Regions:
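Structural motif
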Residues: 154, 470-474, 506
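Phosphate-binding site recognition
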Residues: 1-422, 441, 445
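Metal-dependent nuclease catalytic cores in nucleic-acid-processing enzymes
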Residues: 183-191, 341-349, 431-436, 488-508
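Active-site metal-binding core of divalent-cation-utilizing nuclease and nuclease-like domains
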Residues: 144-149, 438-468
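Mg2+/Mn2+-dependent nuclease catalytic core
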Residues: 174-180, 478-495
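Domain-level recognition of nuclease-like catalytic cores that cleave nucleotide substrates
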Residues: 497, 503-529
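Catalytic cores of nuclease domains that cleave nucleic-acid phosphodiester backbones
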Residues: 415-451, 455
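Conserved catalytic cores of phosphodiester-cleaving nucleases, focusing on short active-site segments
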Residues: 430, 455-461, 469-480, 492
Length: 529
């Protein structure tokens, strides 16, 4: 049992000792399945606070022959698997935490020599006859051990990408590290000594000339999680169970911390869910572990369409994003799409794999992103926020004429790239125009199911503002009549679907006349029976 070679299971025991532990050992069924196969090279990337280290520690505790973990896993899902004991504590495991290695190594350029020297020294304790004194290369050492003994290794690397993210300008450190990884995992020789390779970090593997530097790895990311989706964050069913156990309002938890759409799973941020269960406070827990130092420079980059995209997403809209151009490093960001893709990997944005769109996933992230934007505000954002505030005030004053004028102004000045063609384009402008309501209202619900039809937008006030702000039901029309829009709300019995959310309700009808290129607006207060 060593620091890097065949560690014990104490790190995973800490997770099990915690008041809340959500069983993710089902992941081991997959890793057992791909042991000693070409699919046994896994890079599982996800944002901070999504349980990367807990997962790495779990795999180490299960596979390492430096400990006995049968009792530890006895009540977990993996214990029901037929091959549970077959692989339990049966392998030589090398577990590296690159973030931790930075300090004892004495700097980024010394990380590779430090890891190699320390790991080889520990390997010599297990295989003293297999390693010549002159062996300095870790890949060579593993190859020599395999040639003499036939032994294969499980390699687990936590925070694999820290040198890619944090040392972006240090070309030597990055080159040495990428070459180290190539030596460890790429080519025919590593297949002889690798039983399983599991890398976890925030970024997928760095691309070079559009190809992965380690293209033999299967990548599971926030863009394409594949079959590992249930093991990235907490699933909806897991959160429902916790909410019931801790007597928390599941719908409130969902508004605050849901929104990461991974394959067919709604995934929640684990750290935030655990915090709200233990503390009972609905707030942002993001800034306790994530720094603005990364995202503020990103959103202030001067790429065409970036700031408009940020405003649109803060307003509740989704924006198209081409994720293919991002090279999975921070030095080669060249466009709006690269920025948005990086923000998806960081967890500041969600991603719809089917629609290829990015969006702000939940209330927690909306608050954090708004704070990040306001920490170094753009002049155009400050002016836009004021215009949006004026629009909200006019809406609450039921001044339809002023609302129409302000929506037209916002379209012309901030969203002119959105060409009016139909009701969908009008709705895109509307979400941008009402950005200011995000302080007082939840993310607007698009096409809320109602009594006899659908409302285009429903703005529901947050509980703390319910007595001061009415719910807003907005019906959009194209080349029709605002009175028709308001009457349609009444005819379809829209308000019945939200009476439980709010006391007062305003009905807002908005029409755009293509021939006159003018907006019209009519606002009425809903009179309850």
């Amino acid at each position: 049992m060593g620091m890097f070679v065949n560690p014990d299971n104490s790190a995973f025991q800490v997770a099990l000792n915690s008041e809340i532990y959500v069983d993710k050992s089902g992941l081991i069924k997959y890793t057992n399945k791909v042991l000693n196969t070409l699919q046994g090279y896994i890079c599982n990337s996800r944002p901070r606070r999504f349980g990367k280290s807990v997962t790495a520690n779990m795999l180490t505790a299960y596979y390492s022959r430096g400990c006995n973990s049968e009792a530890m896993f006895a009540d977990l899902e993996i214990s029901k698997s037929t091959d549970f004991k077959k692989h339990l504590n049966q392998y030589d495991v090398i577990h590296l935490d690159i973030q931790w290695c930075m300090e004892p190594a004495g700097g980024s350029e010394q990380v590779v020599p430090y890891i190699s020297e320390r790991t080889i020294a520990e390997l010599k304790e297990y295989y003293p006859d297999a390693l010549p004194v002159e062996t300095k290369s870790l890949p060579e050492a593993l190859s020599q051990i395999n040639a003499l003994t036939g032994k294969k290794f499980i390699i687990i690397i936590d925070e694999w990408d820290v040198l890619i993210r944090d040392e972006a300008s240090n070309a030597k450190a990055q080159e040495d590290y990428i070459n180290f990884l190539r030596g460890m995992f790429k080519g025919t020789e590593p297949t002889k000594y690798i039983q399983l390779a599991y890398l976890t970090g925030i970024l997928p593997i760095k691309k070079e000339k559009t190809q992965s530097a380690l293209n033999n790895f299967d990548e599971f990311t926030m863009l394409s999680p594949s079959r590992l989706a249930p093991y990235i964050g907490f699933t909806e069913e897991e959160v429902k169970s916790l909410a019931e156990e801790y007597d928390q309002d599941f719908e409130e938890v969902k508004r605050w911390y849901d929104g990461y759409l991974l394959r067919d799973h709604q995934v929640y941020n684990p750290r935030a869910v655990v915090s709200v269960m233990l503390r009972g406070e609905y707030k942002s827990y993001w800034s306790e572990t994530a720094s603005y130092d990364t995202v503020v420079p990103l959103i202030n980059m001067n790429y065409d369409g970036l700031k408009t995209a940020i405003i649109e997403m803060l307003s509740g809209s989704e924006v198209k994003v081409n994720t293919a151009t991002f090279k999975n490093d921070t030095i080669n960001i060249k466009s709006k799409d690269d920025v948005l893709t990086y923000m998806i990997h960081l967890g500041y944005l969600g991603y719809n794999q089917k629609l290829k769109t990015a969006f702000v996933p939940n209330e927690e992230i909306r608050q954090e992103l708004t704070t990040a934007v306001e920490s170094k505000p753009w002049n155009e954002l400050l002016k836009f926020q004021q215009d949006s505030e004026n629009l909200l005030d006019s809406t609450l004053d039921m001044d339809g004429v002023a609302v129409a004028v302000q929506i037209e102004k916002i379209h012309n000045e901030y969203a002119s790239s959105i060409q009016y063609n139909n009701e969908n384009s009008l709705s895109s402008v509307l979400t941008i125009a009402y950005l200011s309501v995000m302080q007082y209202y939840f993310k607007p619900i698009r096409e809320l199911p109602t009594g006899r039809g659908f409302a285009d937008f429903v703005f529901i006030p947050k509980p703390e503002y319910k007595s001061d702000y009415p719910a807003l039901i907005v019906e959009l029309k194209w080349n029709q009549n605002v009175r028709t829009a308001v009457q349609q709300i009444k005819d379809k019995k829209y308000p019945s679907s939200i009476l439980s959310y709010s006391g007062d309700i305003l009905l807002v009808g908005i029409n755009y006349d293509k021939s006159t290129k003018e907006h019209q607006c009519l606002i009425e207060r809903y009179e309850k029976d």
